[in-house]
Amino acid sequence: MSRLNVELPGLDLKNPVMPASGCFAFGAEFSQFYDLSELGAIMIKAATKEARYGNETPRVAETDSGMINAIGLQNPGVHHIIEHELKKLEQFDVPIIANVAGSVEEDYVYVAEHISKAPNVKALELNISCPNVKEGGMQFGVDPQVAAELTRKVKAVSEVPVYVKLSPNVTNIVEMAKAIAEYADGLTMINTLVGLRIDGKSGKPIIANTIGGLSGPAIKPVALRMVYEVRKAIDIPIIAMGGVQNAQDVIDYISVGANAVAVGTANFQNPMVCKEIIDELPTLLDKLGVDHINELYGRTHEVMK
């Protein structure tokens, strides 16, 4: 039996490593670098009811230990994604987690109902926490009751388990998680932190949207803390993300209570990073003296007792 396999609602993962939505396009582009069947899963780019052209450029700015982006959920629309992008991925033996976004509740429900019927989509990721769009997006992710109600409506039409992506831009993430957990099958966390970078010469924001989402190694301590707090409060499957660059980062997240881990910004720096992390994990398990990665699950909570 594999030392890395993980079972979650709707997801039978060969290993706990997957690319995060928005950092891997629709996946097929990366197949030139390695066999995508080696991944635990693929979180594809967000799908909306209609095609979105995204925000004005520039949309990306490098920061110390990370980057700020304001792409604006650019995508060709849910039906194009189902008919073209998802079909390209059918050749790979890997479960797909489809990211669902929208401007109003009805958009989320529409996208979820349609994309959850695709044969290789095994779970949905409900994107209620994107800080880069002027309507929808994060507005659903900062009010516990609104988030819970949206989750309930999406869950009612989805043919696969529903995971909800939590925003770190809230006062109390545990309160959000508890409200959503009433209807969700799992959580993904965290989305980007709202950030700003300005040009030192002119004082103008570098990104046309003014603000954007901060990601990369800079946010890992925040994400670790939030995963730790949510896991301490409730028992629900968690796919963690935020600054993952190597196998030790994966171990850190599993230690605080994540079941699996998604790699985001690092894919832009190194398209091989997910495969390298997967290959590195058994060696790290040997060094830690454990047979299966699940033995490390939640160990931080155990040593704190």
From Swiss-Prot:
Q: Where does FMN bind?
A: 21, 45-46, 99, 127, 165, 190, 216, 242-243, 264-265
Q: Does the keyword Cytoplasm apply?
A: yes
Q: Which CDD domains match?
A: DHOD_1B_like
Q: List the catalytic activities from the record.
A: (S)-dihydroorotate + NAD(+) = orotate + NADH + H(+)
Q: What is its EC number?
A: 1.3.1.14
UniProt cofactor note: Binds 1 FMN per subunit.
GO MF, any single term = dihydroorotate dehydrogenase (NAD+) activity
InterPro entries on file:
Aldolase_TIM, DHO_dehydrogenase, DHOD_1B, Dihydroorotate_DH_1, Dihydroorotate_DH_1_2, Dihydroorotate_DH_cat, Dihydroorotate_DH_CS, Dihydroorotate_DH_I
Gene Ontology biological process terms from the UniProt entry: 'de novo' pyrimidine nucleobase biosynthetic process; 'de novo' UMP biosynthetic process
* Principal place of residence: cytoplasm
Q: Name one Pfam family in it.
A: DHO_dh
* SUPFAM superfamilies named among the record's database cross-references: FMN-linked oxidoreductases
Query: Which pairs are disulfide-linked?
Result: none
Listed under GO cellular component are: cytoplasm
Domain of life where this protein originates:
Bacteria
Q: Where in the cell is it found?
A: Cytoplasm
Instruction: Give the matching Gene3D superfamilies.
Output: Aldolase class I
* Record carries keyword NAD: yes
Annotated active site: 130 (nucleophile)
Q: Which UniProt keywords apply?
A: Cytoplasm, Flavoprotein, FMN, NAD, Oxidoreductase, Pyrimidine biosynthesis
| Pathway assignment | Pyrimidine metabolism; UMP biosynthesis via de novo pathway; orotate from (S)-dihydroorotate (NAD(+) route): step 1/1
What's this protein's family per the entry? Belongs to the dihydroorotate dehydrogenase family. Type 1 subfamily.
Under which name does UniProt file this protein?
Dihydroorotate dehydrogenase B (NAD(+)), catalytic subunit
Q: Which gene is transcribed and translated to give this protein?
A: pyrD
